[in-house]
Regions:
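Short, hydrophobic/π-rich interface segment
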Residues: 145-187
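An N-terminal amphipathic alpha-helical segment
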Residues: 111-139, 146-148
Length: 228
């Protein structure tokens, strides 16, 4: 059967990736223990890249069995593992909180983001009327673990934000054309890594800029419905 062939081919790719991850993990340790931290760092980056690629493969593996409900069960696992928070602030701004920094632009990074953000957005808006912000600012706030200050200097142009913007546009924007939505990027220190995204009417953006300096460490309370 075709489904079985695809299933086994994908499983083979997973096994190959795991083998390469094991090799890279050994290299990370070897270079570190032999005093070559720069090369250990390079190998660690490669290990992380292989890990992301492996995750993408394992996420589609259950569906290739043809089992009913495989996609829904996989989405539930993703939701529990990467608990994305979605809602409206007290001011009426739409917000998404992702419990990680967004990855750099690379092969597979957009698919990785789509795999956890799209199900979270779909679930939040299920049964709710559409919301469309016009003439707004899309603000990306990269919150980095203060124990890792080197992450403060992020190259915002090299971060995979396009997929996030595209998914948000499906639910809260007419589209992401510059005439509709401007973009703003900033970084802040926190107790742990996360990404906060806000959709703010332009006339409210000066207010958000002031409030951004004193946002609580865990983020503001988000509501199921928009009050404003």
């Amino acid at each position: 059967m075709k489904a079985e062939t695809t299933y086994m081919k994908t499983l083979g790719k997973v096994e190959a990736k795991l083998s390469r991850m094991k090799e890279q993990a050994a290299a990370v340790r070897w270079f570190y223990e032999n005093g070559n931290l720069p090369e250990s760092y390079n190998r660690a980056l490669r290990l992380e890249e292989l890990s992301e690629q492996t995750v993408l493969l394992t996420r589609v593996l259950p569906a290739y069995t043809g089992a009913a409900g495989a996609t829904a069960q996989t989405d539930a696992i993703i939701s529990n593992t990467i608990p994305v928070e979605v809602g409206f602030t007290a001011e009426g701004w739409f917000s998404v909180r992702i419990p990680a920094l967004l990855p750099k632009k690379a092969s597979g990074s957009a698919d990785y983001i789509r795999s956890y953000l799209y199900p979270a957005m779909r679930k939040f808006f299920e049964g709710k009327p559409p919301v469309r912000f016009r003439d707004c600012v899309l603000a990306y706030r990269h919150v980095y673990d203060r124990s890792r200050p080197e992450r403060a200097m992020r190259d915002h142009d090299n971060i995979e934000t396009n997929m996030v913007t595209d998914i948000l546009a499906l639910y809260v924007l007419p589209d992401d054309h510059p005439a509709v939505c401007s973009h703003y990027y900033c970084s802040a220190a926190g107790s742990e890594d996360r990404t906060e995204v806000y959709v703010i009417p332009k006339h409210d953006f000066p207010m958000w800029m002031v409030e951004e300096k004193t946002l609580p460490d865990k983020g503001v309370k988000l509501y199921e419905v928009r009050f404003c």
